[in-house]
Design a protein with these regions (language model features):
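Internal, conserved structured core segments that host functional sites
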Residues: 94-142
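A conserved C-terminal secondary-structure "cap"
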Residues: 189-228
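Secondary-structure boundary elements
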Residues: 44, 106-119, 172-177, 204-210
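Catalytic cores of processing enzymes, dominated by hydrolases/peptidases
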Residues: 127-205
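N-terminal short beta-loop-beta anion/metal-coordinating cradle
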Residues: 1-90
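Hydrophobic/aromatic beta-strand patches that form the interior of the parallel beta-sheet core
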Residues: 47, 84-86, 118-120, 177-182
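Non-transmembrane, aqueous-exposed alpha-helical and coiled segments at domain scale
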Residues: 80-81, 93, 142, 148
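Short coil/turn connectors at secondary-structure junctions
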Residues: 14-17, 43, 80-82, 114-117, ...
Length: 228
């Protein structure tokens, strides 16, 4: 494998889907929030992305079979919105800047092909003392201010590293609208509590009230076993 490769499982029928990213990172906040959305919407995996930029290991499943690291794309429909949800095993090494740009471009091309023009990225924000605060950055000041009343605080004068920041920035250059939700975390272990706060803020912002009640002790940190 010398370049990113998409494996399409089926082609979902989606209309103007919202693209939601939640990958590994600080406290795995984004990943847990994304998997909460997958569970809440009963989303189905429809594509996988493999790339030579991912770390050099394989994941071993419960049945003893192995596979390389991957990203997975899930499709979901609710009465309010259609979604493409991205989550995955890992990210390219932080020092490999070219790999991050390349894979983020591939992801945005893929989402654009399916009709996406609005993106939500989710991740963690390092804080010495966490208070379940959720911060927002956006592609425009107007958009950021619009969602302050939905439970988020403005994130200013900082950086958003990895795919969570880069996807939003590159999407803006394509003319998309979008936001980033950041949950405060110490960065140690899986932060289920703040991930749940990010998920609830996302639902408030998108006005998509899901019936499912997710307790922070039950926030999914792994893919459903039937989809490994």
């Amino acid at each position: 494998m010398d370049k990113p490769y998409f494996r399409q499982l089926f082609n979902p029928e989606l209309k103007n889907p919202i693209f939601v990213e939640g990958l590994t990172g600080l406290g795995n906040v984004g990943m847990i929030a994304a998997r909460s959305l997958i569970e809440a919407t009963d989303a189905k995996v429809f594509a996988e992305l493999y790339a030579p930029y991912f770390p050099d290991y394989v994941k071993v499943n419960k049945d003893g079979t192995c596979r390389p690291p991957r990203y997975r794309f899930y499709a979901a429909k609710t009465e309010k919105n259609h979604y493409i949800i991205l989550t995955g095993d890992s990210q390219p090494p932080m020092e490999d800047t070219l790999a991050h740009y390349d894979i983020c471009d591939e992801i945005l091309n893929f989402a654009e092909k399916h009709g996406t023009k609005f993106i939500v990225t989710m991740g963690g924000l390092t804080a010495a003392n966490t208070a379940d605060d959720v911060y927002i950055a956006a592609t425009s000041e107007k958009l950021a201010q619009k969602y302050v009343d939905k439970g988020a605080k403005i994130y200013s004068e900082g950086r958003i590293i990895g795919a969570t920041g880069l996807l939003l920035g590159l999407a803006k250059k394509r003319g998309w609208k979008g936001i980033c939700l950041l949950g405060t975390t110490t960065g140690f272990g899986a932060e289920r509590g703040i991930a749940l706060a990010v998920f609830k803020t996302l639902m408030n912002i998108l006005e998509d009230k899901q019936d499912i009640i997710i307790d922070k002790k039950e926030c999914p940190t792994k893919e459903p076993t039937e989809q490994l």
